[in-house]
Amino acid sequence: MTQQQVRTRFAPSPTGFIHLGNIRSALYPWAFARANDGVFILRIEDTDLERSTQASVDVILEGMSWLQLDHDEGPYYQMQRMERYKEVLAQLQAAGHVYPCYMSVEELDALRERQMAAKEKPRYDGTWRPEPGKVLPPVPEGVKPVLRFKTPQGGVVGWDDKCKGRIEFQNSELDDLVIARPDGTPTYNFCVCVDDMDMRITHVIRGDDHVNNTPRQIHIFEALGATVPVFAHLPTVLNEQGEKMSKRNGAKAVTQYRDEGYLPDAMVNYLARLGWSHGDDEIFSRAQFLEWFNLDHLGRSAGQFDEAKLRWVNAQHLKAMEDAQLAALVRPFVVQAGVPETQLDADDRLPRICALFKDRCETLVDLARWARVFYVDAIEPDADDFAKHVTETAAPALDAFAAAMETVAWNKDAINAAIKDVLKQLGLKMPQLAMPVRVLTMGTAHTPSVDAVLELLGREKILARLKSR
């Protein structure tokens, strides 16, 4: 028997920006499809007409594109599938799985109040549910009914969740779900089932806020004669305060992390570890993640976001990246920091600057700040470093060093030899010269090897900055 091809989906609602908690629900189904030579589908659940916007769709697509979570099919839009939903609804109604309910909102509210007063769980009581021998109330004039799904009344509904283990619900706990509104538009749980059936979804990997929807969806799948997919309900992502990550609680849009200089592969690495593990491995490439990923090592407890940890993960990926590749990624940030493209194109220094400074940086923004210093005309040295190191005592050494820089052959070894000559002539130790030189030429006393920095900075800029004191 041929094994069924894995087909997964990410089905966001376009009602706002997409944050890290949302995007993790895209990462895992994407990774599972890629790891199994499967198909990853993007579906936009845009039936909330009041809140759904095209701008939100664009933000979802932009965030997924940045993280390179490419989809094989879609995006499909639920609003474009309304005729299909109504067709399937008619089939269910013809098969006796659906019935019209004429109970008004006022009647439902009164029922709920009576149940709560009796300390019962509020639920629809089946007034309009047709049963053999049951006499239904007279149909009220001018009232458009909702359509309800006939939930099985006995036994249990359950599934083996790939994240949470066995989950079961008593059917007696579930009332008859509204699956179409009075105007005929179908509701969320019904649309999802039709989509998953039509798109042949094999694995539904989503947040655990959907656990309570799942028994209802299983009943609908079974009524449709569809194969019930495998479910994996991911634990919540918490923010740094331990609350559920959400826009209201200050979560940032995924694209903001892009603008702050995080690398897509570092974000994938960090998000992967927020609910899945491969032994003690903390840092891994996208290719390694896809090689290792399966549903057997999903965590059961909530993952808590930690921005300091994210920065650390990003720093590891920065250090490991090829210099030319890193230069291409940091370039727009250097331009944003005020360096014209023409200056960057004038020489090949940017990859070498990246090589020299990437170990000191956590983000592309950090790296761009260092790179900027090599291209701009004037810099503003750190005031504390200037006061500490650029003193009258340092002046003779700086003058001698400036004179040496005017004639030295321009390579790292020659610059190093010139520094040592000045130290020897004046009887100084390296920090007595290197520190003020760093402050004047780079703006800070804390840089990599001074000869390597000076070689990249160039004779003209060094002399101009030494004279500016």
Curated annotation (Swiss-Prot):
Compartments it resides in: Cytoplasm
Sorted UniProt keywords: Aminoacyl-tRNA synthetase, ATP-binding, Cytoplasm, Ligase, Nucleotide-binding, Protein biosynthesis
Bridged cysteine pairs (disulfide): none
UniProt-annotated binding residues for ATP: K247
Motif 'HIGH' region positions after renumbering to this chain: 12-22
Record field: catalytic activity: tRNA(Glu) + L-glutamate + ATP = L-glutamyl-tRNA(Glu) + AMP + diphosphate
Location of the motif 'KMSKS' region: 244-248
Pfam families the record matches: Anticodon_2, tRNA-synt_1c
SUPFAM superfamilies with a match to the protein in the record: An anticodon-binding domain of class I aminoacyl-tRNA synthetases (SSF48163), Nucleotidylyl transferase (SSF52374)
Single GO BP term: glutamyl-tRNA aminoacylation
The UniProt record lists the keyword ATP-binding: yes
Enzyme Commission numbers on file: 6.1.1.17
Aminoacyl-tRNA synthetase found in the keyword field: yes
InterPro entries: aa-tRNA-synth_I_cd-bd, aa-tRNA-synth_I_codon-bd_sub2, aa-tRNA-synth_I_CS, aa_tRNA-synth_I_cd-bd_sf, Glu-tRNA-ligase_bac/mito, Glu-tRNA-synth_I_codon-bd_sub1, Glu/Gln-tRNA-synth, Glu/Gln-tRNA-synth_Ib_cat-dom
GO molecular function: ATP binding; glutamate-tRNA ligase activity; tRNA binding; zinc ion binding
Organism domain of life: Bacteria
Record GO cellular component, one term: cytosol
Subunit structure: Monomer.
Role, per record: Catalyzes the attachment of glutamate to tRNA(Glu) in a two-step reaction: glutamate is first activated by ATP to form Glu-AMP and then transferred to the acceptor end of tRNA(Glu).
Family: Belongs to the class-I aminoacyl-tRNA synthetase family. Glutamate--tRNA ligase type 1 subfamily.
Protein name: Glutamate--tRNA ligase
Native source species: Acidovorax sp. (strain JS42)
Gene: gltX
